[in-house]
Design a protein with these regions (language model features):
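Short, aliphatic-rich beta-strand segments
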Residues: 1-13, 76-77
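Non-catalytic substrate-recognition/targeting regions of SAM-dependent transferases
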Residues: 2, 18-88
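Secondary-structure transition/turn motif
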Residues: 11-16, 94
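Rossmann-like S-adenosyl-L-methionine
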Residues: 60-204
């Protein structure tokens, strides 16, 4: 369960919890006191449990983006159309821990998604942040978030595969003081272990 101001984004991945879905929704609606709730039940783990993948609004109305503040920066979240449940809250404390080290630095944010690392770094005094992602919508959100946070002039975007971008930046002689590598899961199943391990070694 992730909360974005007046909106909850909820994901169920197991058949046991799916059976309790009506009760879960009723309790969250009662306890959280929010205006809307989204079911982000589109994870591949549901297929292993024989459950359909779906995204739906449980109640209320959701108008994207929904704005939140994290570590002094503003981010427009897409609970319905974004990745995962809309944002990666699990890295919030790690992002905060990095901020004392970024003042005056050139920052490279690989697999940036909405710029959680790069935009925060710019807000905390980085000279510049380059956010790299293969997704055009993700990079559009980076630009929007940077402008909303007052650091649009110091945040750039590059739409490219992160592996290819690293090679191109190295060949161009680019140098960075801080590099953030926050990739998606390369090993989602046991059969992915060998190739996934190679990918982690390559990107690091």
């Amino acid at each position: 369960v992730d909360r974005y101001g007046p909106v909850l984004s909820v994901q169920i991945g197991t058949a046991g919890m799916e059976a309790l879905r009506p009760q879960i929704q009723a309790l969250l609606q009662q306890v959280a006191g929010v205006e809307a709730m989204v079911w982000r039940n589109d994870t591949g783990a549901r297929e292993l449990e024989g459950l359909p993948r779906e995204v739906s609004v449980a109640f209320g109305e959701v108008h994207e983006p929904v704005w939140i503040e994290e570590n002094g920066a503003r981010f427009g979240i897409a609970p319905i159309s974004g990745q995962k449940t809309g944002w990666f809250y699990d890295q919030r404390d790690n992002r905060a821990a990095l901020m004392p080290w970024v003042r005056g630095a050139r920052v490279l944010d690989l697999f940036s998604y909405g710029g959680g690392w790069g935009v925060c770094a710019a807000v905390h005094g980085a000279d510049s942040a380059l956010c790299v992602d293969a997704s055009a919508p993700a990079l559009a959100s980076v630009a929007r978030n940077a402008e909303a946070s007052g650091v649009g002039a110091r945040v750039r975007t590059l739409q490219q595969d992160a592996f290819d971008a690293c090679k191109a930046l190295r060949e161009a002689g680019e140098r960075f003081d801080v590099i953030v590598v926050d990739p998606p899961a390369f090993i989602k199943r046991k059969k992915d272990a060998e190739q996934g391990a190679l990918a982690y070694r390559r990107i690091n």
